[in-house]
From Swiss-Prot:
Residues that bind substrate: 197
Protein's pathway: Cofactor metabolism; retinol metabolism
Enzymatic reactions: all-trans-retinol + NADP(+) = all-trans-retinal + NADPH + H(+)
Name of the featured protein: Retinol dehydrogenase 10
Gene3D superfamilies: NAD(P)-binding Rossmann-like Domain (3.40.50.720)
GO cellular component annotations of the record: cytoplasm; endoplasmic reticulum membrane; lipid droplet; membrane
Active site (UniProt): 210 (proton acceptor)
Organism name: Rattus norvegicus (Rat)
Classification via InterPro entries: NAD(P)-bd_dom_sf (IPR036291), Sc_DH/Rdtase_CS (IPR020904), SDR_fam (IPR002347)
Tissue-by-tissue expression: Detected in retina, entire eyecups and in liver (at protein level).
Enzyme nomenclature, EC number: 1.1.1.300
Taxonomic lineage from the root: Eukaryota, Metazoa, Chordata, Craniata, Vertebrata
Amino acid sequence: MNIVVEFFLVTFKVLWAFVLAAARWLVRPKEKSVAGQVCLITGAGSGLGRLFALEFARRRALLVLWDINTQSNEETAGMVRHIYRDLEAADAAALQAGNGEEEILPPCNLQVFTYTCDVGKRENVYLTAERVRKEVGEVSVLVNNAGVVSGHHLLECPDELIERTMMVNCHAHFWTTKAFLPTMLEINHGHIVTVASSLGLFSTAGVEDYCASKFGVVGFHESLSHELKAAEKDGIKTTLVCPYLVDTGMFRGCRIRKEIEPFLPPLKPDYCVKQAMKAILTDQPMICTPRLMYIVTFMKSILPFEAVVCMYRFLGADKCMYPFIAQRKQATNNNEAKNGI
């Protein structure tokens, strides 16, 4: 094709992509069904991972829950089973009201499987993934959600904690994706969800290891998405989730300027997950919550660094992590004193 003709064709496609993106904002696409599909969630024992599990359960997905904490993971599984029982009761009532003429997918056919897995350890991931394939089947939806934060200034952070943060928050995405992507490629079907953070798009002081891990996983996700497009595997979808500070306790104590905080409060976990689910079920490539994060990311990309610093200082975002780090340090000291260390 003539390069001039191709240039105008590409220009048209780019403009059309803007039109489609605008249409998605105005008219919400229909959500796809995940009923009966195997959905694996890492870090399912608490926080966003638990809420993702409950949302997928309500949509009749068959759940595989991974967490390093066996007890917490089983608690999540119990909540999922309760949802399944409620759905089963509702289906039974609907069948009775319809004299048995309606065909309804009974949730009693769905199960939840729990696995204790440290996703920061490569061999543990691969061994657990093999167990899942043998005991459950192939995974259709992979939600890479597990994450940790050390809560130390760089020069005070032990090397092993930095390595742990990178392993869990970033490297684990490589291992889980390598474990489950091959079958997705074979059948050209699946969905990979990367739960990152707004701190994977812009940074702040005092959380160098966390920001590095989240920037890394955002880069991994974007490259993977491009690789799937290059391979013309359009049946495999990807969604990048980048929420602002979520009120799960992970960053307890983090504060921006008090006059600004009412306009940009920590996100409620339920709201964050519901917004992410809308994006996942409509095959949206990326979601930042709240939408203001799109603007912040754009401004960070075009403004001079000193201008960004001025904005951070005005918002109180330059040292917003310092109270959180101080609380972590105090808690560590209290534990050491309690244990006689």
